[in-house]
Amino acid sequence: MGDLAQYLITGVGIGCAYALTGSGLVVIYRVTRVVNFAQGSFAVLCALTVTTLLAAGVPHGLAEGLAVLLGGAVGALTGLVAIGKPGTTPQSGLIVTLGLGVLAYAIEILLWGDQPRSFGGLSGSVTIFGARIQTHYLLIIGVTAVVLAGAAALFARTDLGRALTATAADPYAARVVGIDVLRMGLLAFAVGGALGGLAGVLVTPVQQVSFDSDVALVVNGFSAAILGNLTRPALTLAGGLFLGVVQALVGGYLSTAYQTEVALLFMLAVLIARAGRRDVVEAA
């Protein structure tokens, strides 16, 4: 029972990081229709930045906060390159984000090398259902809940959120009523970058990161977002938590070597189910 509880709770913690990464993808896609394949790079860049800031004597909390702000700034710059030029299409934006992701690889290797890095998180542990759980996992869960609830309130209850929602629903109509669609797109990239950066900052104390860690994050985040068709944050959260728990169970009872395959199989199953449902609707 103790092992099962440990796998479930740690899986929820890691799943929250996947949900944050996937939520960043959803925000960007809903507003710009661009699939941002540099999303994982935001997470890695911010996590590695924290290691440098802490080594320079910047205190915990401030270092993580500055790194998340950096993620937002890098996200906005990514958006400027991907969609800033008039006439760009979602397809060209996707290609740009792929290229920027490769550039991020090179920068991260140049600045931090290719060895995995980590930094200390919230210390201590608690006993839950007979399992000793690192307190940092509870921090990940709590921060994710607060951030995603805040994001939902932003979209539902503020003028800025309504402008983002209007742009996502119909960019042409948004322009007609005076909404700056490009500004909303850049803001979406900034929010996506901050969410990705937050995911990296939260997960690094329990999972080391290196320049290529973005692959696992973006695969799992994209798999979570696929459950919600890249447009539904609640299903993205559910997908991230499901992936985190299943991967923790697979890693605990079988082997950690199969964890990435879990995300790929999940994505494949969702796509097949969606295609089958579409065929049934068309036949009817």
In which residue ranges do the predicted regions lie?
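Membrane-interfacial amphipathic/re-entrant helices at transmembrane-helix boundaries
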Residues: 1-21, 49, 58-63, 89-94, ...
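Single transmembrane alpha-helix segments in multi-pass membrane proteins
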Residues: 3-55, 78-88, 92, 227-234
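Helix-loop-helix "hairpin" substructures at the membrane interface of multi-pass membrane proteins
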Residues: 10, 14-15, 132-210, 233-238
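Transmembrane alpha-helical segments in multi-pass inner-membrane proteins
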Residues: 18, 22, 59-69, 189-196, ...
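Cytosolic-side transmembrane-helix boundaries in multi-pass membrane proteins
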Residues: 24, 88, 111, 169-183, ...
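Alpha-helical transmembrane segments within multi-pass membrane transporters and channels
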Residues: 25, 58-100, 107, 239-243
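Pore- or pathway-lining transmembrane helices of multi-pass membrane proteins that form conduits
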Residues: 41-42, 79, 84-109, 214-226, ...
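Transmembrane helix-bundle core of multi-pass membrane transporters
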Residues: 85-157, 184, 254, 283-284
